[in-house]
Each structure stands twice: as C-alpha cells, then as structure tokens.
C-alpha cells in the first residue's frame, strides 16, 4: 500500500544531475581518456585503509601529467584500453584506483619533465597476506604502457589493516640477538670466496677459519646451490662440521648461511630440513625465487625456529635506474611483509651502488617500528609497522676493516657487516682476516661508547689499534686506501649527498 503521507521526492538539483550525467558518460562505448573515466580525482582524500603508491612518471611528449597519472591508476587497477559495460556490474567507483596528486620532480637528472604521482588503492583490491598479488597489481602491467616514457615506483604506504594480514619476519632482531647472545655491536660475517669451484672439504675449511678468527657468520653466496663441483649435501655437512667445531673452541654461538635456493619448493624444503637436522640456526634464500616462495620459506622458518637470510640477488636489474623500475625502499617493505630476518640493503662505502642517505633510508624501513617522513632519505610516507618484527639489514660488497668507523657511524649496531674479500683475501690467511675485522669492530664500538667522534677520528683509532694487532695492521696496509668513490646513479631528489668513500 502506498504511503502518501511521506514527503514527495524532490527533483535533483542541477549539480546532482550533472554529476549523474558525468558518471553515465564514463560508460559510453569507445575509447576515453583515463582521467575522464574517473582515475584522476584531485579532490580525493585517502582513507587510512588505502594503499598509497608514489610513482615517478615520465610522460611521452604530448601526454599531460594528469592523464599519465590517471593511466597508471587505471592500468594498475580496473581499466583496460576501452570502456567495457561490465564495469556496471561492479562497485567500480570504489575499486577504481584514484590518482589524486601530481607534482613535478625537483631537478630531474635526465633533463626531461618528470612528475611524482600519488595513487590510492582500495584495500579490497588485494588478497590478504600476498605480496605476489599486491605486486601483480601495482607493477604487473603498467610498466610497459606506451604513453609513459619511463615509470618508477618510489615508495608505498601500506595500511595497518593490510599489514596485519602478513606474518612478517619469523625471528626478528630482538629474538635473534637472544639466540646468539650477542649485544651492543653489529654482527660480523663473510661470504666464502671464490663463490664457485671449491670442493666441499675446502669450503668447510674456509668456514672454520673465518669463524675461529672471530666472525659470527660465514655464508654461501647467491649462486652456490648444487653444482657438479659440490653437491649441496656435501657443502652442508662440511660447513656445519666447521660451525660446531668453531663453537666448541670459541665458546660463542656461530652460524653459516646455508643457501637452500633450488629449482622447486620441494627441493628447498628438503634442503632446509636437512640444514635444521645438522643443527644450523639459519638458512638462506635468494630474492630471485619470487614473492610466493619467499613467503613460504618465511612460514617454514617461523614454524621451525630458524633465522631466514635473504640475498637480494637480481635487484639491481630494476632498482638501480633513477627514472624506471622500483626503488629498493619498496622492495625492503615487501621483504619485511613477506617475512625474512636478514636482507642485504647496501653499504654506501663498498663496491655496489648506493647513496649514503638512501641506504640509511633502506635500513630504517627494515628495522624501525615506525618510519616518519624523511625526504632526505627518500621516505615519503609515515609508515606504522603494526608490530611486525624487525629485519636485520646486511652491508656486504667491497668493504674492509679500514672502513669500520664509517660503517658503524652510518648504520649503528643493528646491522650485519660482511667482509668476503676483506676476510678471505687477507695476506696472512682467512683466520687473520677475520681477526682483523673483529678487532677493528671492537675498537670502534669501544671508542664510540667512550664518546669519541669515530666518524672523524676513526682512521687514527684504527692505526692505534693496529700497533697491537698484526692482522689489523696488515689489513690496513693492504686495503687502507681502497675506495669505490663513484657518483651514485640513484639518490634522493630532495638532498644530494656525496659518496662517503
């Protein structure tokens, strides 16, 4: 029965009618500009539950920056190249990504206009606990889009509601230090060199010498898996024999990162289980195994009380170029979500590319409970980590004892300093190389704790210590003047810093 007592419905005002007409026009058949389809919304206010991505866009000539930003939003969410009627079967206004802010990049290095585009994504667009699904949207298809000359994902804000669906690191910095009973200093490591070609027995000898000399860890390199010259099982047996012997002789907890990277997940699980049976406290994986495999190994490590080390093998193919690819600060966030305990994050002073402030930003993303906006270190968003455990950053690649003061000053205590060639290339042998690094580290930690200015006094402090430590003196004589002083290819847009090398 009709209720005529209710107030009659008033005709829509002109603004409402215009809005409805504009909305209907988005579904006219044919090709429309992305910003006309609703992917450019400058008045949009992001919600606390939105995933926000910051892209550096370089439009093709003639493409307006707002249209380029809208295209990125569209192609990384719900759009295709033409209007489709099935949009009307979805809550497309909610699911549509929204480019809400575009601003020019200050002083673009390439000399052509670049823009920062801020894009918000509804949380329902992503599967819970899946970095693979997150990346399939954010970087899955849009990087090959023709209207863009180049595209780079610079940073992301991950909402707490989404972070809570991830396990995060299986062990974390606090629990790892408890297991190792090592506090108040960075951990020391080294990569076995040469990375390929050693027999299992000689490999184990390198591990023993390094640990006996004072290192906390030795490690496999990224490409040592199971090759004809050394089957993985042989390497594990000899390496763990060395670990147990060094532990018994030094009274310290030691470890070796046994690389379980393999061609299938079944093989990786088999290797990890064998490492655990041998008494290892840690296993290692490579970034190239992919996000689903990383997450799976993180869950295995959590269930089995193992530390999980990640080598960022392959990252330079997409992180190094300033105008195209993905910043490593984003990779660092994804790694923390997927669940690793260690992650290589740069040295600033070694042989691998990395601006000092940018590298500090990567470290902060991995090991802080909350990241505040810090444009000088490339951090664009406040990021609350919702209780996810902290990842221990790893400095590795072309570093030596003569740089110990720089490394400690840059990165502090919660880091792992890995000296591969700087240990195994020592003129008096591996054990002497390890001792040189341990003495250099303890010298710097003691001086810092006494209030000394290690950044400026470090070289003199090392020289003084070397008068009482022949291995350190030999290390300084061999590598003291070795630097890799090149201009970084990627540095923060809001602060230009020289190399510290």
Curated annotation (Swiss-Prot):
* Cofactor binding notes: Binds 1 Mg(2+) ion per subunit.
Active site positions, chain numbering: 193 (proton acceptor), 311 (proton acceptor)
Q: Where does Mg(2+) bind?
A: 219, 221-222
Keywords on this record? Calvin cycle, Carbon dioxide fixation, Lyase, Magnesium, Metal-binding, Monooxygenase, Oxidoreductase, Plasmid
Superkingdom per UniProt: Bacteria
Q: Name one GO molecular function term.
A: monooxygenase activity
**What residue stretch is flagged as signal peptide?**
none
Q: Which cofactor does it need?
A: Mg(2+)
Q: Where is this site: Transition state stabilizer?
A: 351
Summarize where substrate binds, as residue positions.
Answer: 141, 191, 195, 312, 344, 396
Q: Which Pfam families match?
A: RuBisCO_large, RuBisCO_large_N
- The PTM N6-carboxylysine maps to 219
Query: One GO biological process from the UniProt record?
Result: reductive pentose-phosphate cycle
Q: What is the catalytic activity of this protein?
A: 2 (2R)-3-phosphoglycerate + 2 H(+) = D-ribulose 1,5-bisphosphate + CO2 + H2O; D-ribulose 1,5-bisphosphate + O2 = 2-phosphoglycolate + (2R)-3-phosphoglycerate + 2 H(+)
Q: Does the keyword Electron transport apply?
A: no
Under Enzyme Commission nomenclature, its number is 4.1.1.39
The answer to whether the entry has keyword Metal-binding is yes
Record family assignment: Belongs to the RuBisCO large chain family. Type I subfamily.
Q: How does it assemble?
A: Heterohexadecamer of 8 large chains and 8 small chains.
Additional detail: The basic functional RuBisCO is composed of a large chain homodimer in a 'head-to-tail' conformation. In form I RuBisCO this homodimer is arranged in a barrel-like tetramer with the small subunits forming a tetrameric 'cap' on each end of the 'barrel'.
**What is the documented function of this protein?**
RuBisCO catalyzes two reactions: the carboxylation of D-ribulose 1,5-bisphosphate, the primary event in carbon dioxide fixation, as well as the oxidative fragmentation of the pentose substrate. Both reactions occur simultaneously and in competition at the same active site.
By what name is this protein known?
Ribulose bisphosphate carboxylase large chain
This chain's source organism reads: Paraburkholderia phymatum (strain DSM 17167 / CIP 108236 / LMG 21445 / STM815)
Q: What is the organism lineage in this UniProt record?
A: Bacteria, Pseudomonadati, Pseudomonadota, Betaproteobacteria, Burkholderiales
């Amino acid at each position: 029965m009709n209720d005529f007592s209710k107030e009659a419905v008033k005709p829509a005002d002109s603004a409402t009618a215009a809005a409805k007409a504009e909305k209907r026009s988005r579904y006219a058949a044919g090709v429309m500009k992305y910003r006309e389809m609703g992917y450019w919304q400058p008045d949009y206010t992001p919600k606390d539950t939105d995933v926000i991505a910051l892209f550096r866009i370089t439009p093709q000539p003639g493409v307006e920056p707002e249209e380029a930003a809208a295209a990125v939003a569209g192609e990384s969410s719900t759009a295709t190249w033409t209007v489709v009627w099935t949009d009307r079967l979805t809550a497309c206004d909610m699911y549509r990504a929204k480019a809400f802010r575009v601003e020019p990049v200050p002083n673009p290095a390439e000399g052509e206009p670049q823009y920062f585009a801020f894009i918000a994504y509804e949380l329902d667009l992503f599967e819970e606990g899946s970095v693979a699904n997150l990346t399939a949207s954010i970087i899955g298809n849009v990087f090959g889009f023709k209207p863009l000359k180049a595209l780079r994902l610079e940073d992301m804000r991950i909402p707490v509601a989404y972070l809570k669906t991830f396990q995060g690191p299986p062990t974390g910095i606090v629990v790892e230090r408890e297991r190792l009973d090592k506090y108040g200093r960075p951990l020391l490591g080294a990569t076995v060199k040469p990375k390929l070609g050693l027999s299992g027995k000689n490999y184990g000898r390198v591990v023993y010498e390094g640990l006996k000399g004072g290192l906390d860890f030795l490690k496999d390199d990224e490409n040592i898996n199971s090759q004809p010259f050394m089957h993985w099982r042989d390497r594990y047996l000899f390496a763990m024999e060395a670990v147990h012997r060094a532990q018994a002789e030094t009274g310290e907890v030691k470890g070796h990162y046994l690389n379980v990277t393999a061609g299938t997940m079944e093989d990786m699980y088999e290797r990890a289980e064998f490492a655990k049976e041998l008494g290892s406290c840690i296993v290692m994986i490579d970034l190239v195994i992919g996000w689903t495999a990383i997450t799976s190994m993180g869950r295995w490590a959590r269930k089995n009380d193992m530390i999980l080390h990640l080598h960022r093998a392959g990252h330079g193919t997409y992180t190094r170029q300033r105008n195209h690819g993905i910043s490593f600060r984003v990779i660092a966030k994804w790694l923390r979500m997927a669940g690793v305990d260690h992650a290589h994050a740069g040295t600033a002073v070694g042989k691998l590319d990395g601006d000092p402030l940018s590298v500090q930003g990567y470290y902060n993303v991995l090991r802080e409970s909350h990241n505040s906006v810090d444009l000088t270190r490339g951090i664009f968003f406040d990021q609350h980590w919702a209780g996810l455990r902290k990842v221990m950053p790893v400095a590795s690649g072309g570093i030596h004892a003569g740089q110990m003061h720089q490394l400690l000053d840059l990165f502090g205590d919660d880091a792992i300093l890995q000296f591969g060639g700087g240990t195994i290339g020592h003129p008096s042998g591996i054990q002497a190389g390890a001792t040189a690094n341990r003495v250099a580290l303890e010298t710097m930690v003691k001086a810092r704790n006494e209030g000394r200015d290690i950044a400026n006094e470090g070289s003199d402090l090392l020289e003084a210590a070397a008068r009482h430590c022949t291995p350190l003196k030999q290390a300084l004589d061999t590598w003291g003047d070795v630097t890799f002083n090149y201009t970084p290819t990627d540095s923060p847009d809001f602060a230009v810093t020289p190399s510290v090398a």
